[in-house]
Amino acid sequence: MATSQYFDFAQGGGPQYSAQPPTLPLPTVGASYTAQPTPGMDPAVNPAFPPAAPAGYGGYQPHSGQDFAYGSRPQEPVPTATTMATYQDSYSYGQSAAARSYEDRPYFQSAALQSGRMTAADSGQPGTQEACGQPSPHGSHSHAQPPQQAPIVESGQPASTLSSGYTYPTATGVQPESSASIVTSYPPPSYNPTCTAYTAPSYPNYDASVYSAASPFYPPAQPPPPPGPPQQLPPPPAPAGSGSSPRADSKPPLPSKLPRPKAGPRQLQLHYCDICKISCAGPQTYREHLGGQKHRKKEAAQKTGVQPNGSPRGVQAQLHCDLCAVSCTGADAYAAHIRGSKHQKVFKLHAKLGKPIPTLEPALATESPPGAEAKPTSPTGPSVCASSRPALAKRPVASKALCEGPPEPQAAGCRPQWGKPAQPKLEGPGAPTQGGSKEAPAGCSDAQPVGPEYVEEVFSDEGRVLRFHCKLCECSFNDLNAKDLHVRGRRHRLQYRKKVNPDLPIATEPSSRARKVLEERMRKQRHLAEERLEQLRRWHAERRRLEEEPPQDVPPHAPPDWAQPLLMGRPESPASAPLQPGRRPASSDDRHVMCKHATIYPTEQELLAVQRAVSHAERALKLVSDTLAEEDRGRREEEGDKRSSVAPQTRVLKGVMRVGILAKGLLLRGDRNVRLALLCSEKPTHSLLRRIAQQLPRQLQMVTEDEYEVSSDPEANIVISSCEEPRMQVTISVTSPLMREDPSTDPGVEEPQADAGDVLSPKKCLESLAALRHARWFQARASGLQPCVIVIRVLRDLCRRVPTWGALPAWAMELLVEKAVSSAAGPLGPGDAVRRVLECVATGTLLTDGPGLQDPCERDQTDALEPMTLQEREDVTASAQHALRMLAFRQTHKVLGMDLLPPRHRLGARFRKRQRGPGEGEEGAGEKKRGRRGGEGLV
């Protein structure tokens, strides 16, 4: 049949050539060129072919240049109409006799590539598709078209002319050339003025090597015209631009009857990158650009919606050029960019390609949507076709536009408009901001110029301005625009503030590097703060462990060692389980000590009563000091005493200090007496004591409405007793630091010697001074030692209950407890601390031949146990040894003078299968309690 003779390439092999001219059936008048989409390709835009001019049948001859034919293979199912451009790479370059004189090198495709191409079937059915060849000045390329409605065929036409494809108009066409013409003299293809949007064709199914080898031979895509009614063409003298079979190579050329149009200049291929706004001269340069670092950065910036060309030094960009995708920091910089060579180059390139050029009015980059730059758009051009349906969403890649020929008018609605400026056009360069000399936060180009007088002009010998030199910044520049930008810039403003005007305001927005350094510093500070907080939490947890009742020490379901079978070996003890550092399980001794401490701690009512009485006494003594100072001043004025003294305005009463158990926080339940030390500027006398005792009741009435009784002790004490329950007594000891000083140390100081009989008891005054020193030492050394205060309270209760321990001085006991607890290797619980103190006493610390206790608050070596006799020391040592034996046999409650605490309920404790009777458990418990009550405590 005619179709099988027209396509004569074998399937799966390379192009075959034959020297015998085949007998070709000539097409009828109504025949038209058809194109079908190639199977196996992704949907793409189907470009149209240039229309062919009618030619006569008798004068038919093959094209004098290269003949383009397509290989044939069995018919495959034709897919539905697609919208993306499908590029078919099955080329076979058959050479005619006339073309062999100038073309020696055939272009062949591999068999693997040709085997996957779609051609017409060898059968002569009406649905047979035909392939057409189109000459190109740079190679061979075919564009497949989707099958559309076939034109109406006249009754006189043969069946071989039936086709399903587009019918092309005959407005323009490519005329056949003579056999003597060369390849580069082909006329430029004519384009349909109707242009549609370019949809950025992609090649998802192409191998990279195939694309690299075939990309130089891609001709420009042609826009498809809308399908129109079938046209009846007059009989042409010869078909122009028709495809020829491989066997038509040996057919002698027929003389051309139509005039050949004048060929225009050869158009170079332009490879355009929409992302970078640049063009490449060749495919190799274009591929290198796509693999370059600059293109990858801009592509990544488009995906994330960040402007690739941000403003320098972290300053937020204000103006944006949509044509070059460049951000400017101000109106001056934007105007300089518009005048620059880069913008002009991109402008000329867009004008040459026929791409839409956005308005030159600056658009605020901050007000544009973040995805405006990254949104892939399809630029229009003369070699771009619009698709009938939108393409599938793909990642934005650089589109390659092969542009040839002059640009054509844009089609209406081909692509959306470029982003219009949302704000009106800004003022020209040099417009100062409203803030005066203040720097604009968005950039420094809009700020008012600062210090232009420090920029001097450098002239040549002829008097021509060579450059500008800034004396503040020690920099030079050649352009007047650069000078204007410099005096508005941040660097110049910083130097101006540093050297000329320190009060010049400058925007404090840091640069990207400074911001990173600040963030790193803040991160380190947060890390250190978290570590300190974690240490503080651990310290508080340790304190709560010592003060509060810790969790159960024995884990649940822990059977005793003897309950395991002999063959299983000895299991690990519960204490060997990993515990948190600083945490220890609570013992029975700890529970008993803490329970005893809770019973001897003063009640809230007692603490409030002590606080109220002490506060009233301190305020009343302050008023007494003021009254005595006024009396002394009046007496001196009356006597006319003009003798100069070291401190003429010194008060007699200097201050009052808390001492004893009140200052140390060792109050127990039932304590009703607290002590205060009243310091004087001179040695206290009995007359001063009487004056204080007389003034104090009147000042107490002025301070409070509570009733107090004031009494004086001839031994340098004043007692204030409250008349309300609980009755608290505040003992005030009058003393002076002069009682401890040696008069011989300051021989040059002359002091009036008081009467020896009028001075208060030196012993009582020294005891008051010693109590003041003891309170300061305790607050510095023992108050921060957590179990120390608890143990001292428990031992004070022991000294109060047991007469044997009553002989131990309170100050010696405090020193002993502090030494025992502070010398431990690790933190101790309350029970272990009591045991350690008893061990120290039991080893003979209190005996005369023992180490003893050195008083740290005395100048000379003084034993704190000096008031104790030898018998008392031995009795306390023996009592401590007996207490240790009771602790070893779990009789801690007898040492502390309390009842035995019930054991804790454990989840893993054994239970009886048979429930106890109503009175069985209670009776047994009562017998045990009665038996234990018969024991004896400390003696």
Curated annotation (Swiss-Prot):
InterPro entries: DZF_dom, DZF_dom_C, DZF_dom_N, Matrin/U1-like-C_Znf_C2H2, NT_sf, Znf_C2H2_sf, Znf_C2H2_type
A Pfam family it matches: DZF_N
Ranges in a coiled coil: 516-549
UniProt KW Ribonucleoprotein keyword: no
Domain annotation DZF: ranges: 570-935
Claim: Coiled coil is one of the keywords in the record: yes
Cross-referenced SMART domains: DZF, ZnF_C2H2, ZnF_U1
Pro residues composition-biased segments: 217-239
Alphabetical list of PROSITE patterns matching this protein: DZF (PS51703)
Gene3D superfamilies, per the entry: 1.10.1410.40, Beta Polymerase, domain 2, Classic Zinc Finger
Biased composition (Polar residues): 137-147, 157-184
GO molecular function: double-stranded RNA binding; single-stranded RNA binding; zinc ion binding
Region annotation Disordered: where it falls in the sequence: 1-72, 116-185, 217-264, 289-314, 360-389, 401-449, 545-590, 906-939
SUPFAM superfamilies in alphabetical order: beta-beta-alpha zinc fingers
Keywords: Coiled coil
Composition skew (Basic residues), residue ranges: 906-916
Name of the protein described by the UniProt record: Zinc finger RNA-binding protein 2
Record organism: Homo sapiens (Human)
